[in-house]
Every structure is written in structure tokens, then in C-alpha cells.
Amino acid sequence: MNPSSPPSSRSVPIAACFDLAQDYDRAARVQARTATALADRIAKRYASSAPPARILELGCGTGALTRKLSALFPNAEITAIDLSPGMIARAREAVPGVIYYVMDAEHPELTGPFDLICSSFCIQWFNDRAAAFRRLAHLLTPGGRLEVTTLAQGSFAQWREACEAEGLPCGFPDYPALSQLSADYPTSLQGIWEGETKRDPVGTARRFLQDLRTIGATTPREGSRALTSTQLRRVMQHFDRMTNEMDYRIAYGSAVRTRGVFVTGTDTGIGKTLVSAIVTKALDATYWKPFQTGLSDEAGDTASVTTLAELPSSRVIPPAYAFLAPLSPQDAAALEGREVDPTALTLPESDRTLVVEGAGGLMVPLNSDTLLVDWAATLDLPVILVCRSGLGTINHTLLSIEALRQRNMAIAGVVMSGTPNPANRAAIAHFGRVPVLAEIPHLDEVTPQHITRQAEILRDALHRAGF
């Protein structure tokens, strides 16, 4: 960890602007109201659950949100970072007992995991939100929360209208729509964005611009050209004739780091267990196969994954149901006079990512009422779909993808098993609109060493998905 990490090239002028913002709190009216609203939302998220033990705040500024976090969670270890040394100094004075670093929030060099990462009015300064969200997901504990606000499409509408009316360009950044913000979440973050308009009584154009300078928010859109003094005067006069208020469109993002992944397949016997071992190794995860059949013929998938991924017993959760016959869970249970009750099953507690392996394909019946896919949908885990690489795989894989999407299940990607087939891979990626995470070739011998090598390859693809 570097407590004073070098900022990116675009961050340098941003930090300089905020360092000069001596009267920030007086002018940051909307920022203060938004920090209060975000704190209220965070309090509601934790009203019926355990409070976060470790919190990371991005872009803490002078400590408006930091103060509220400290009051909400007095026993938490709070780390707050900001690009501006001046802002950090003021926050440290206002809210003692917090760990402060001068650091680029888009590239935090910190050791996780954190239970809560939050930020108010920081991520609009990021160069690459999607990449930043992936990095933040890596810092969250499984089940941890991301709670942020940012400016969204529709902000400063009155100023933009005045510029357009005068036929002049607006130098303000183009803020994203809620749909774009949602698309920026990696698969490992599942959540929503909600919008709210806050109207600020700025009075006049001059006061509005002065307040922006006061809070240091003067970095223009990249590539924009500054207005001449005459042009700026025209826009200000038009604004004053039109209104004395300014709209801030606020986006509230709330997401949870998924607790793991669900590994399933287009059929039985296609390599789900092999892929589960590889994924478990790649993510340093805990493994669980809730429904195990066929124990009359073999030791079972739990034993195989334990050996191949070299797992200690603490990272292996025994099956909830284990049956002798190599049949569907419904039929295997019936032969033993039993019945599977999936409603009684919830995800086991684990401080690691969980890899949950299914039984057979998606449409395997668990009992007379429930298919495997319907139970899996209740877990809120993104899916890794294992398919064959050869003839027939396009149809089977696309049908499985369609079944997952009908149930609003997130798909982390597809892993193909067998002799690599570039045409089939391209068709599945194109028509399925999913990433192909890896192609696992046929292995004459499967050993822990083979699993380790394949895990190193798959780890990069999973990392790009936020795991």
C-alpha cells in the first residue's frame, strides 16, 4: 500500500483545483445535502443487518460524509482517501479517529477487503468508470456493499440551455445516463441506480460560477474550448433572464458484491466438476455442491474438487443432499424414499467467494415442483455456463443462456470444454452476447498441477469480470 500514490495525469489538475478550495463547505450546498441523503440510504441498508467492520470512503473532501459514517458506525475502522492534501488536512481536523490517505480514488492502493465502500460526488471524475468498478469490486468482501453518488445526465440543464440558445459550446462534462452507469457494473457487482433532481437556488450566473470555483469543480470537459469573456457574458446574461436556479441530477448507486458464482452446464458429463475445481482454485474460493447423486459408482464431485483444487476441509462444504443412484436429484431421492426440499437451503456462510456447482443441466428436476435453474435463481449468483466445444453446442448453449435470461440471472461467461472450435466460440459469443472465459482442452490426465495451470489462465478472465 502506498499512502500517497501518484495520481493519473488527468487527476493532477483536479487535485490542484480542490486544493485551492478554501471555502468549500460554504459553497458546497448540494454536496452537503447529497452526503446526508447518501448517509440515510446507507443507514437503511444496514438497519436489519450487521454493521460494516471496515469502511472505505472515496473522495472524502472536507469530511461531510466521513462525519456521518463515523456517527453511524462508531466501532468501524474507516479509511478515507482524497486526491487533495488540503482536503485531507481539513477532514482529519474535522473527523479524528479515521485513517486518511492522499490517494487517487480511481486507483486505490489499499489492502482489502472492505465491507462497505462509499463515495459522494467522486466517481464523475474517473477516466474509466467500468475499470474502476472492477477494482473496487476486488476490494469488497463477498456480500459487501458499494454505495455511491455521482452527477448524471441532466445536470446543469439550465446552463446548457443558455449556451445552446446563444449558439455556443458548453464546457461542462457530459454526464452518464443511469443505463450507462448500470452497464459499467462488472458481473460481480449486482445492484441498481436511482436518479433524483436537486434544484439549487444559485441566484445569478455569476454566483453559480463563483461557487463552482470555490468548491474547485472547474475542470472542463476534455477537449472543450474555453469561452471568450464576451461569449461568457452572453451566456450569463441569457441565464439570468431565464432562471435563478440550477438542476443537479444525482445518481445513487447501490450494489452488492456477489457472494460467489454458480457453475452449471448445458448437459451432464461435460466437465462441470473440472471447471468448478479450476474456478475454485483461481478464486481461492470455498466449494459447495448442494445436490450430489451417483455415489454408488464414485466418490462424488466434492471429493474430486477437494483433491484437484487442493482444498483444506475448511473450504469444502458437504452436500446438503447425497444420493446413491446416478439419476436426477428428484429420481435419486425417490429411490431412497426421500424428497429434496430446496426451499430450506440458503447459501452457507463463508468469508471467501463461494463456488456452487449444480447437478446435471439447468432443467434437471429437484422435486416435482422445482427445476435446478429455478432454485439457482434464488441465490443471486452470476452463472458460469460450461458447454461442449463440438457439434451441437451452439443450439444447447444458446437455449441455456435464454433460460437464464428469462429468470434475470446474470451470466459471468461461458467455459467451453473439449477440442477448441473457433467458429463455435465466435457464434456463442456473438449470438449469446456473453464472454467466453476460457476453452479447456481435453486432458488425458487430470492432476492438481493441471488444475493450477488452467486456473492461472482463467484467473485473468474472472478478474476482468470483477472477481
Predicted regions: what is each one?
Residues 401-467:
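C-terminal lobe/tail of nucleotide-utilizing enzymes
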Residues 54-108:
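Class I SAM-dependent methyltransferase SAM/SAH-binding core
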Residues 106-117:
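A short acidic, Gly/Pro-enriched loop at the edge of an enzyme's catalytic core
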Residues 29-51:
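Conserved alpha-helix/loop element of class I SAM-dependent methyltransferases that forms part
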Residues 130-142:
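A short glycine-rich, Lys/Arg-flanked "PGG" loop and its adjoining helix->strand segment in the class I
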Residues 192-258:
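Conserved Class I S-adenosyl-L-methionine
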Residues 145-205, 218-226:
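Conserved catalytic/acceptor-binding region of the Class I
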Residues 274-337:
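N-terminal phosphate/diphosphate-binding loop that engages ATP/GTP or pyrophosphate donors
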